Amino acid sequence: MPIFSSLNSFLRRHKKKLIVTATLTFSAYFLVNQFIIKKLKNFQNSLRQELFVKEQIKRRFVQTQNDCYLTILALLPVLTQPIINHLPIELITQALKLKKTNSNPTPQEISDSLLTTDNLTMHQNTNDSSDLSHYMSLSKTELWKLLKIKTLTRTLTLMYSISGLLLLTRLQLNILARRSYLESAIILAGGKVNDTETSQDYFIEQSYLSLSWWLLNKGWLKISDLVEKVVTEKFNTINARTELSINKFDDLLCEMVNELSTNHNQEILNAVFPISYDNLIESLLNTNPELIKELDIEDSIMLKLINETTYLVSNEAFGDILINMVDSCKSTLIENLLLSLDPENAYTNQEKVIDISNIKQFKLANLLAQLSIQCGVLCDNNNLMNDTFSNELSGNIYMNNLNEIESLDEFSASIYSNFE
C-alpha cells in the first residue's frame, strides 16, 4: 500500500536520526527519573535522620532530668544533716521539757502537749551532754526565743539549700549531657574520639560535679547565717504565745523571703556555687587539688565548664528561678500546715481548696511544732509516692513539686539545647 511504502521509505531515510533521538530521549528520561528518585530518597533519609536526632535529644534530655532528681535524693542526707545538727531544735526542746518537769506549770505557761515527741520532729540528734547543759542554763523565756529563731531558720535554710542544690545540679548535669551528646554526634558522623581524652574528660567532669562540695559544706552555713539575721529581725517581738492565722504566718514568711531576695541575692548565689576565685580554690583544694593548674590553661575543659557555670549562676534568670523554687517550698509548707492544723479548710472532696480568709488562729508554738515536722518531710529522700491527699506527707512532696516547676524545665532545656 502507498502509505506503508512511504512510511517504510521515511524510516529508511531517517533511521540513524530516529535511533539517536530515541536513545537520547530514553537516556534523558532515565537520568531525570533517577535524579528525582535519588533526591526523594535523600530527602526521606534526611527527614528520618532529623526525626531520629530530635527523638534522641528528647530522650537524653528526659533521662538527664531524671538523673538530676535521683542525684538530689541521694545527696539530701549529705546536705540536710549538717543543717539539722547546726540548728539543734530537738536539744532545745529537750531542755524545755526537762525544765518543765522540774517546775510547776503556771496558767500562763505553754502546754506540755506542744513539746511532745510526735509534734516536734521526725529527726533525733544525739544528745550531747555539754550542749544540753548549756541550754539547761538558760531560762524558759530564753529557750522559747531560741527555739523560735532556730526552727524558722532551719526551715528557710533547708528550703534555700535544697532548692539551690537542685538548681545547680540541673545546670551541671545538663551542661555535661550536652557535651556527651555532641561527642556521640561526632562519632555517628564518622569522627573519632581519643580514648585517652575520653578517660581524662570523664575525670574532669566528675571533678566539675564535685564543686557542689561548696554548697554541701560551706554554702548552707552562709545561707543559714543570712536567714537567721532576717528571722531575728522579723520575729523578735513575736513570742511563742502569740496567736497567728496561717495567712498572717504566710505573710511573715513572704516578707522574709522578699528581704533575702532583695538585699542578699548575690550572697545567696555565692553560697550556691563558688563564684569567687578564692572560694573556687578552696573547693578544689578539698576535692581535686591536682586540677587547680587547669584554671591557668585557657582552653582547658575544666575552665570552660567553670566559666559557663559561673556565667549562668550569675545570670539574673538563675536567681529568679531560685526564688520561684523557694516560693514553691513555701506554698507547699502552707498547704501542709493547713492540712495538719485546720483540715476542714485544707481540702474538699480530696482536692486542695485553701480558704485562707476563714481560718483559725494558732499559737506560734503550735506552728513551730509543725515546722519541725515539715523539716523532716523536706529532708526525706525515700520519696514515697501516695495518691491520697491524707497520706501525702509520707513522701517528699516538696521535692516532687520543685521538680515539676515549669521555669526549671525551661532553664534546663535552654542549657541542654545551647550548642554554640
From Swiss-Prot:
Gene Ontology cellular-component annotations: peroxisomal membrane
GO molecular function: protein-macromolecule adaptor activity
Record bears the keyword RNA-binding: no
Transmembrane intervals: 17-37
Highest rank taxon of the organism: Eukaryota
Compartments (UniProt record): Peroxisome membrane
Keyword line: Membrane, Peroxisome, Peroxisome biogenesis, Transmembrane, Transmembrane helix
Topology, Cytoplasmic side: 38-420
Example of a GO biological process term: protein import into peroxisome membrane
Membrane topology: Single-pass membrane protein
Peroxisomal side: 1-16
UniProt similarity note: Belongs to the peroxin-3 family.
Protein function: Involved in peroxisome biosynthesis.
PANTHER family, A to Z: PEROXISOMAL BIOGENESIS FACTOR 3
Protein name in UniProt: Peroxisomal biogenesis factor 3
Organism: Debaryomyces hansenii (strain ATCC 36239 / CBS 767 / BCRC 21394 / JCM 1990 / NBRC 0083 / IGC 2968) (Yeast)
Organism lineage string: Eukaryota, Fungi, Dikarya, Ascomycota, Saccharomycotina
